């Protein structure tokens, strides 16, 4: 889905934050003891610490004893968390602390602090009976940055759009000679001069685009839109002078009635649909590549939990593709008799069968050491296997086919692997029950 690993890592970060938002939104507490604190990048830890000390004094006057103690406890937890930082991290700091009530009605303390994957320009401190995640949601909505080149006969404008923020990076005007019938014997020379000036103008636009949209040898925008009223945009997109890396990122050519800033606004309006589908298109491309490996029978693919984990262990997986709502859980169990660890991968249906958690010979129940969704385990560990993790949806036709036909888990491999002729080295310490696939 992403051409470079950094974009894939970013997608994993986004998925982690989405998951965090989901669990924070569902959490509820008694009273107002749930603290949401967001510190923007250039703020000072000392200022926030002083503000918390003042809040601590104010909270000491709360009438209800239970609420007072839980609020003071939450403020103390936040203060302890802040002591771990000398200064605010480059992207800001998000802290959630408080006592939540679980589904069983038990109280549970929550302490979360992390630096978001990109700058969060919001300052927030709230005590409430729920966590406030609006700023985090806003962080996700506008994650991709798109480049715009507005080019017509009077000048060119270069801009970017990220979420709702548009920015003009550079603009210049140009004075191109118009077509005319005068000149007599010099008419051809005039036409040649005019073509030469046009050519130089297109070259200048192409060179400026490289300076603005390529940094460190990589394109710094998710896609490019070329807009204009004449055929300059077509000329630019087909020109040899236009950098190949940028050419491959062109999403759309847009016809507009104006140049300059008005044209920029119009270009944004006319290309909103394309921009919102970029992730969708990247996903279709990725799964299309995966299906291509299967249809050509290259052997450079795997699907299902068992084969994918074998390939990961071998370091053969280049791109690990997992459905965002994969419902397989990973259990680490300790066998009482043999003192061995056993790892299970079960779907919700299989979890109901308690025989997976007991020793078949002795009937003893295994001790549960760890349980977490398999996707979460992948998100935490995929780098150890030298793979990039791509989390896909089932909204596209390809995505839906991948989830229904391949169980929502698979990978594109670096080299051919013959799974049939390979005996798994781990013996019986791993159990895969894949009847559902």
Swiss-Prot record:
PTM sites of type Phosphothreonine: 347
Domain of life: Eukaryota
Placement of covalent cross-link Glycyl lysine isopeptide (Lys-Gly) (interchain with G-Cter in SUMO2): 87, 404
Modified residues (N5-methylglutamine): 185
Example GO biological process: nuclear-transcribed mRNA catabolic process, nonsense-mediated decay
One Gene Ontology term of the molecular function aspect: translation release factor activity
Motif NIKS motif location, chain numbering: 61-64
UniProt keyword list: Acetylation, Cytoplasm, Hydroxylation, Isopeptide bond, Methylation, Nonsense-mediated mRNA decay, Phosphoprotein, Protein biosynthesis, Ubl conjugation
Entry GO CC: cytoplasm
Pfam families in the cross-refs: eRF1_1, eRF1_2, eRF1_3
Major location (coarse): cytoplasm
Description of post-translational modifications: Hydroxylation at Lys-63 by JMJD4 promotes its translational termination efficiency.
Sites bearing 4-hydroxylysine, chain numbering: 63
Ranges in coiled-coil conformation: none
InterPro entries: eFR1_2_sf (IPR042226), eRF1_1_Pelota (IPR005140), eRF1_1_sf (IPR024049), eRF1_2 (IPR005141), eRF1_3 (IPR005142), Peptide_chain-rel_eRF1/aRF1 (IPR004403), Ribosomal_eL30-like_sf (IPR029064)
PTM annotation (N-acetylalanine): residues: 2
Subcellular location: Cytoplasm
Family matches, as PANTHER family: PEPTIDE CHAIN RELEASE FACTOR SUBUNIT 1 (PTHR10113)
Function comment: Component of the eRF1-eRF3-GTP ternary complex, a ternary complex that mediates translation termination in response to the termination codons. The eRF1-eRF3-GTP complex binds to a stop codon in the ribosomal A-site. ETF1/ERF1 is responsible for stop codon recognition and inducing hydrolysis of peptidyl-tRNA. Following GTP hydrolysis, eRF3 (GSPT1/ERF3A or GSPT2/ERF3B) dissociates, permitting ETF1/eRF1 to accommodate fully in the A-site, followed by hydrolysis of peptidyl-tRNA.
Quaternary structure (record): Component of the eRF1-eRF3-GTP ternary complex, composed of ETF1/ERF1 and eRF3 (GSPT1/ERF3A or GSPT2/ERF3B) and GTP. Component of the transient SURF (SMG1-UPF1-eRF1-eRF3) complex. Interacts with JMJD4. The ETF1-GSPT1 complex interacts with JMJD4.
Protein name: Eukaryotic peptide chain release factor subunit 1
Organism whose genome encodes this protein: Pongo abelii (Sumatran orangutan)
């Amino acid at each position: 889905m992403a051409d470079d690993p950094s974009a894939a890592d970013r997608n994993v970060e986004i998925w982690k934050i989405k998951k965090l938002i989901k669990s924070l939104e569902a959490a509820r507490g008694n009273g107002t003891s749930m603290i949401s604190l967001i510190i923007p990048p250039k703020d000072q830890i000392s200022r926030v610490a002083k503000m918390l000390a003042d809040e601590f004094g104010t909270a000491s006057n709360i009438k209800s004893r239970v609420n007072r103690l839980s609020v003071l406890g939450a403020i103390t937890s936040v203060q302890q968390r802040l002591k771990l930082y000398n200064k605010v991290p480059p992207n800001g700091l998000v802290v959630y602390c408080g006592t939540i009530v679980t589904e069983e009605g038990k109280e549970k303390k929550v302490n979360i602090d992390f630096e978001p994957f990109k700058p969060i320009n919001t300052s927030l401190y709230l005590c409430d009976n729920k966590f406030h995640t609006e700023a985090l949601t806003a962080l996700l909505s506008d994650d991709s940055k798109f480049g715009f080149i507005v080019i017509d006969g009077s000048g060119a404008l270069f801009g970017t759009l990220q979420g709702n923020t548009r920015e003009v990076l550079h603009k210049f005007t140009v004075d191109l000679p118009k077509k005319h019938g005068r000149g007599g014997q010099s008419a051809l020379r005039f036409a040649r001069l005019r073509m030469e000036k046009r050519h130089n103008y297109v070259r200048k636009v192409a060179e400026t685009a490289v300076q603005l949209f390529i940094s460190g040898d990589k394109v710094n925008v998710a896609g490019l839109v070329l807009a204009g009223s004449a055929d300059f945009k077509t000329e630019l997109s087909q020109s040899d002078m236009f950098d190949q890396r940028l050419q491959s990122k062109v999403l759309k050519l847009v016809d507009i009635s104006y140049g300059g800033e008005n044209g920029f606004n119009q270009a944004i309006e006319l290309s909103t649909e394309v921009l919102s589908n970029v992730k969708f298109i990247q996903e279709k491309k990725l799964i299309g590549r995966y299906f291509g490996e299967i249809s050509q029978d290259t052997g450079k693919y795997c699907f299902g939990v068992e084969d994918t984990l074998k390939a990961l262990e071998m370091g053969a997986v280049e791109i690990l593709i997992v459905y965002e709502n994969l419902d397989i859980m990973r259990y680490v169990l300790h066998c009482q008799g043999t003192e061995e660890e056993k790892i299970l991968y079960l779907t919700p249906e299989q979890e109901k069968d308690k025989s997976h958690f007991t020793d078949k010979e002795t009937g003893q129940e295994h001790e549960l050491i760890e349980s977490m969704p398999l996707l979460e385990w992948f998100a935490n560990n995929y780098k150890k296997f030298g793979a990039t993790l791509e989390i896909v949806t089932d909204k596209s036709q390809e995505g839906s086919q991948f989830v229904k036909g391949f169980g929502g888990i698979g990978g594109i491999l670096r080299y051919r692997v013959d799974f049939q002729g390979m005996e798994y080295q781990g013996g019986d310490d791993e159990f895969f029950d894949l009847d559902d696939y």
